[in-house]
Structures are given as structure tokens and as C-alpha cells.
From Swiss-Prot:
NCBIfam families hit by this protein: PRK00136.1
SUPFAM superfamilies for this protein: Ribosomal protein S8 (SSF56047)
Family stated for the protein in its record: Belongs to the universal ribosomal protein uS8 family.
InterPro entries, sorted: Ribosomal_uS8, Ribosomal_uS8_sf
UniProt-listed Pfam families: Ribosomal_S8
Name this polypeptide is given: Small ribosomal subunit protein uS8
Gene Ontology BP term (one): translation
Originating organism: Corynebacterium diphtheriae (strain ATCC 700971 / NCTC 13129 / Biotype gravis)
Gene Ontology MF, one: rRNA binding
């Protein structure tokens, strides 16, 4: 059976592994998931990620990041635009997560961007997820 929402699956795996204090989490890979992982890394939510090419399919492995006393770097993750209800935002009406403390991941014509990058470039798009 095919997966209906691979992005929601990725975010759920990250949330569950983070809550269980795992060091890494693996999942099936795609270009979109790798781009989301790149944004999470550049924003400091994960330590690193790698795409491993197996015989069957590619695997994306995220190395989760914790503070000195095992404090989570990711407090929460929420899927916004879903297959049944797409959510779009104009460049003038981009969402801010927790007043700018979190990150909104937006799919634009310039690729995947954070809310701050999309505001700088003046582009809108589909709001995929919030991370804080």
C-alpha cells in the first residue's frame, strides 16, 4: 500500500524519535524529505543528515540534536498543508511560528524555503510544516 502523506510520516518519525531521545532516525528518502532535512539542519534543529543508497531504495537518516542535559532542540512539529486540505500563503501573509522563534517550511517556486527566506525573496507558496 502506498503512503498517503510522506511528509507527515517523516515529521511523525522525527517527533517520536525526539520524544524517545533517540540519537538518529531513519526513513525512506525522497528529494523533498532531503530538502526538509537540509532546512532543519541549517536552522539548527538536527545535527546532520545523510542519504544512504541501498539496494532496494534510498534511506534518509537524521542525526537528532540535544542540549547539554539532553534537552530537545525540537520542541514541536506540526504538519500544516495536508493532502486533503492544502494551505497556501501569499508573500505578504506568511505565517510566523511562535512570533519568529520557530520556523515555517514553505514550498515555493524557488524551492523549499523558511518563512524568513520567503519573506526576503518576496515569494509565497504552500505552507508544509511548522517546527519550533
Amino acid at each position: 500500500m502506498t503512503m498517503t502523506d510522506p511528509i507527515a510520516d517523516m515529521l511523525s518519525r522525527v517527533r517520536n524519535a525526539n520524544n524517545a531521545h533517540h540519537d538518529a532516525v531513519s526513513m525512506p528518502s525522497s528529494k523533498l524529505k532531503a530538502n526538509i532535512a537540509e532546512i532543519l539542519k541549517s536552522e539548527g534543529y538536527i545535527a546532520d543528515y545523510k542519504v544512504e543508497d541501498a539496494k532496494v531504495g534510498k534511506t534518509l537518516t537524521l542525526d537528532l540534536k540535544y542540549g547539554p542535559n539532553r534537552q530537545r532542540s525540537i520542541e514541536g512539529v506540526r504538519r500544516v498543508s495536508k493532502p486533503g486540505l492544502r494551505v497556501y500563503a501569499k508573500s505578504t501573509n506568511l505565517p510566523q511560528v511562535l512570533g519568529g522563534l520557530g520556523v515555517a517550511i514553505i514550498s515555493t517556486s524557488h524551492g523549499l524555503l523558511t518563512d524568513r527566506q520567503a519573506t526576503e525573496k518576496g515569494v509565497g507558496g504552500e505552507v508544509l510544516a511548522y517546527v519550533w
